[in-house]
């Protein structure tokens, strides 16, 4: 078996690492110390495609695999565990049950909104 990352996974890792250093690191300590949930940062993660990372494109997601999702969480965790937990919770607790078990109508109604940060599932 080949356990190397794909080119797409490597590019995602670099993109999320850059985002974490540029956007998350400067505010992480302040947000943590002041108990701030950074709405704007969460919207930026949605714009980057990190909410709904494994959701099919027809519902507004990135349609990436589970390893890509894990890579994104890991890269955010390097800088701030709370920020990583935000996308982990949204993808796993909010989005995944609808993606896996929702009716077509539920998927059409909720998944695009969850992927674009118009609705949160955490």
Question: Where are the predicted features?
Answer:
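Glycine-rich flavin
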Residues: 25-122
């Amino acid at each position: 078996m080949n356990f190397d990352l794909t080119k797409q996974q490597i590019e995602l890792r670099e993109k999320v690492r850059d985002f974490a250093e540029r956007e998350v690191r400067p505010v992480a300590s302040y947000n943590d110390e002041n108990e701030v949930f950074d709405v704007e940062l969460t919207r930026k993660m949605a714009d980057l495609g990190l909410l709904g990372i494994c959701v099919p494109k027809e519902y507004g997601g990135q349609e990436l695999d589970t390893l890509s999702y894990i890579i994104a969480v890991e890269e955010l965790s390097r800088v701030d565990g709370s920020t990583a937990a935000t996308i982990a919770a949204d993808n796993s607790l909010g989005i995944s049950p609808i993606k896996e078990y929702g009716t077509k109508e539920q998927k059409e109604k909720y998944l695009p909104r969850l992927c674009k940060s118009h609705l949160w599932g955490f």
